[in-house]
Amino acid sequence: MADSHGNAKGATAHTEAGGGHKAPFPPFQKDTFASQLVSLTIAFVALYLISSRLALPRVRKTIDDRQNKIEGDIAQAQTLKNESDAALKAYEVELAAARTRAQAIGNETREKLNAEADTERKALEKRLSAKLADAEKTIASTRTAAMSNVRGIASDAATAIVQQLTGAMPDRKLVDSAVEASMKG
């Protein structure tokens, strides 16, 4: 097997230029500078054309699509906001109308109940006044009956007392007038 590393006949071990002189770095060589500028210009023009024809339209389309999507979303959000504002206003109007109706119903019911209560109170007062008048008549007739009974009892008692004390029966008219005078005064 042959040694493949550096021992072949006629092969130089290094790629250096002979004479110990080193060549300058290729991009800095003056004789290739113009051709390098042309190559660089061609590469940049090709890169510009490729990016402007292929990559930039895709990026521009993506940006435009995103912008359109954002604008559409903003428009939809504004539409929904306007609808919700309109619904809120309609709700507030309905709520105010419902409050007004509830207050009117409450006032009407209150007035109706007050009128019914006044009617019932007046009817009750009439019944109570009639019962009171009947009771006063009953009391007056009972008092009159009781007073007439008291006069009779007082007259009988006075007659019995005078008879016991004097032993003689007093005059009934005289005893009745004395009892009447003592009851008045």
From Swiss-Prot:
Residues 1-24 are annotated as: Disordered. InterPro entries: ATP_synth_b/b'su_bac/chlpt, ATP_synthase_B_chain. One of its GO terms (cellular component) is proton-transporting ATP synthase complex. It is found in: Cell inner membrane. F-type ATPases have 2 components, F(1) - the catalytic core - and F(0) - the membrane proton channel. F(1) has five subunits: alpha(3), beta(3), gamma(1), delta(1), epsilon(1). F(0) has three main subunits: a(1), b(2) and c(10-14). The alpha and beta chains form an alternating ring which encloses part of the gamma chain. F(1) is attached to F(0) by a central stalk formed by the gamma and epsilon chains, while a peripheral stalk is formed by the delta and b chains. Belongs to the ATPase B chain family. Keywords: ATP synthesis, Cell inner membrane, Cell membrane, CF(0), Hydrogen ion transport, Ion transport, Membrane, Transmembrane, Transmembrane helix, Transport. This is ATP synthase subunit b 2. F(1)F(0) ATP synthase produces ATP from ADP in the presence of a proton or sodium gradient. F-type ATPases consist of two structural domains, F(1) containing the extramembraneous catalytic core and F(0) containing the membrane proton channel, linked together by a central stalk and a peripheral stalk. During catalysis, ATP synthesis in the catalytic domain of F(1) is coupled via a rotary mechanism of the central stalk subunits to proton translocation. It comes from the Bacteria. It comes from Nitrobacter hamburgensis (strain DSM 10229 / NCIMB 13809 / X14). It is a single-pass membrane protein.
